[in-house]
């Protein structure tokens, strides 16, 4: 489940119309949400608040074995007036990221001045009249500041500076500083990661630099198909999207080189929607069955290749129903002939709001219905049937993940009253011990442990609960 500060950063990106999915780093985001989720290992309590549309705070306390915590503050020049902050009102699908439906590329807004577009978001209702000087010059460009202090020692400070330079460019600076032990006289270790992103809708580029080993990096993504900056009139909606990308890193200090390339094919929302009468009439020449959607369910396929290490990874994710999604990943190394296979799924559970209690029947209800039917006009308007979607809400989600070594992860995330709760457990052979070490540590008698596995290898990776409340 996303932290409250990550949720506010996501709301900031949506408020400034920045597409976080149009990036090479998000190429396999759908499979990672279903397969690489983490489970809490201890008891943690989060208290957060969006005190004003511009300022948010968050406090975290962890216990069981080791007591630690963190304090986080966030400031945004863009008012987040329409962002629900109460834990009872935040949509659960915003926090528990599952199958991510890829959206068609969108061109940046360049018709009006970008300063007025970004600086005036949400300010038309909240800015009082006659107070034009209340908005500082920094607010002309959408800016976000976030700082998190982790306690106790060794104290770690994480800071983030995010600023929109133009409708197509965004600058991000992340700082991580670690203070040593109390008796240590060494200076705090710090590193800076800078990232400049350029997104046009058709393609995106990211330029990175890290002070850690003076690392330079580049990431790029190209979307095949029509250019959203030059839309055509009377064009049919795009049904699928094919994207290709690559990344490269180089460090002159450590002579480190890294690169990878990947492909992604995904269906778009128009592929699973029922076409309208006008669009179906125009598509009679291309398909004979225009009354049905092109695809019965959304799906995403990815292929990632790392040439230097010889690694090949493929993923296939699909959403079988609005409440059920599956994903699988197969990895293979051409040098070591090692393989990896992971499968996972998520199941959403909806809670239907209780219907009002029925009126006590005194035996004459049939007569009252007869009288109402007699008084009803012959051509009275028929009320549309009520759907259960508006009477239902997402209550919880269950995620399951298993690999070829029978390492199993179970994660339950849901809402209990006004609290957001995450509970997870990890089962299976310990991944920290190699087979040879496990064989050497096994007694000669080959005894079994209490959990049914080989002694010396833990079958419980961790059990934890995380409780969050925000206002």
Swiss-Prot record:
Subcellular location: Mitochondrion outer membrane
Keyword Mitochondrion annotated: yes
Pfam families for this protein: MDM10 (PF12519)
A GO-annotated cellular component: SAM complex
Region Disordered, annotated ranges: 429-455
Annotated Gly residues bias: 444-455
Entry's Gene Ontology BP terms: establishment of mitochondrion localization; mitochondrial genome maintenance; mitochondrial outer membrane translocase complex assembly; mitochondrion-endoplasmic reticulum membrane tethering; phospholipid transport; protein insertion into mitochondrial outer membrane
Keyword Membrane belongs to the record: yes
Membrane topology of the entry: Multi-pass membrane protein
Subunit structure: Component of the ER-mitochondria encounter structure (ERMES) or MDM complex, composed of mmm1, mdm10, mdm12 and mdm34. Associates with the mitochondrial outer membrane sorting assembly machinery SAM(core) complex.
Task of the protein: Component of the ERMES/MDM complex, which serves as a molecular tether to connect the endoplasmic reticulum and mitochondria. Components of this complex are involved in the control of mitochondrial shape and protein biogenesis and may function in phospholipid exchange. mdm10 is involved in the late assembly steps of the general translocase of the mitochondrial outer membrane (TOM complex). Functions in the tom40-specific route of the assembly of outer membrane beta-barrel proteins, including the association of tom40 with the receptor tom22 and small TOM proteins.
PANTHER family, alphabetized: MITOCHONDRIAL DISTRIBUTION AND MORPHOLOGY PROTEIN 10 (PTHR28035:SF1)
Family, per entry: Belongs to the MDM10 family.
Domain comment, as recorded: Lacks alpha-helical transmembrane segments, suggesting that it resides in the membrane via beta-sheet conformations similar to those predicted for other outer membrane proteins and porin.
Entry protein name: Mitochondrial distribution and morphology protein 10
Source organism of the structure: Aspergillus fumigatus (strain CBS 144.89 / FGSC A1163 / CEA10) (Neosartorya fumigata)
């Amino acid at each position: 489940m996303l932290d409250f500060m990550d949720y506010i950063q996501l709301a900031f990106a949506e408020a400034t119309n920045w597409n976080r999915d149009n990036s090479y780093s998000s190429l396999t985001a759908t499979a990672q949400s279903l397969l690489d989720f983490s489970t809490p290992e201890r008891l943690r309590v989060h208290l957060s608040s969006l005190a004003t549309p511009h300022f948010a705070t968050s406090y975290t306390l962890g216990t069981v074995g080791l007591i630690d915590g963190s304090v986080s503050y966030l400031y945004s020049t863009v008012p987040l007036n329409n962002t629900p902050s109460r834990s009872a009102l935040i949509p659960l699908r915003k926090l528990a990221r599952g199958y991510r439906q890829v959206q068609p590329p969108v061109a940046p807004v360049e018709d009006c001045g970008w300063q007025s577009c970004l600086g005036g978001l949400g300010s038309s209702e909240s800015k009082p009249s006659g107070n034009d000087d209340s908005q500082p010059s920094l607010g002309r460009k959408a800016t976000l500041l976030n700082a998190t202090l982790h306690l106790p020692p060794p104290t770690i400070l994480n800071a983030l500076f995010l600023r929109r330079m133009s409708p197509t460019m965004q600058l991000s600076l992340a700082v991580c500083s670690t203070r040593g032990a109390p008796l240590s006289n060494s200076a705090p270790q710090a590193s800076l990661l800078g990232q400049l992103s350029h997104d046009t809708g058709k393609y995106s580029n990211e330029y990175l630099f890290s002070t850690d080993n003076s690392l330079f990096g580049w990431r790029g993504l190209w979307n095949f198909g029509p250019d959203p900056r030059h839309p055509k009139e009377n064009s049919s909606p795009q049904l699928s999207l094919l994207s290709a990308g690559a990344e490269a890193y180089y460090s002159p200090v450590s002579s480190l080189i890294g690169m990878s390339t990947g492909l992604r094919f995904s269906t778009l929302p128009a592929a699973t929607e029922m076409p309208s009468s006008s669009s179906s009439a125009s598509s009679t020449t291309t398909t004979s069955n225009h009354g049905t959607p092109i695809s019965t369910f959304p799906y995403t396929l990815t292929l990632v290749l790392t040439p230097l290490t010889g690694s090949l990874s493929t993923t296939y994710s699909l959403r079988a129903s609005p409440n059920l999604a599956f994903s699988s990943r197969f990895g293979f190394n051409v040098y070591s002939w090692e393989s990896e296979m992971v499968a996972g799924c998520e199941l959403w559970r909806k809670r239907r709001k209780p219907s009002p209690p029925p009126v006590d029947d005194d035996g004459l209800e049939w007569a009252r219905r007869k009288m109402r039917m007699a008084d009803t006009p012959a051509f009275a308007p028929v009320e549309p049937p009520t759907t259960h979607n508006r009477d239902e809400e997402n209550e919880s989600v269950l995620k399951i993940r298993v690999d070829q070594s029978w390492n199993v992860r179970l994660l339950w995330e849901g809402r209990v009253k006004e609290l957001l709760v995450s509970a997870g457990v990890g089962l299976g052979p310990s991944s920290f011990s190699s087979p040879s070490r496990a064989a050497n540590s096994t007694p000669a008698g080959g005894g079994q442990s209490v959990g049914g596995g080989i002694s010396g290898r833990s079958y419980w990776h961790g059990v934890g609960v995380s409780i969050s409340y925000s206002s």
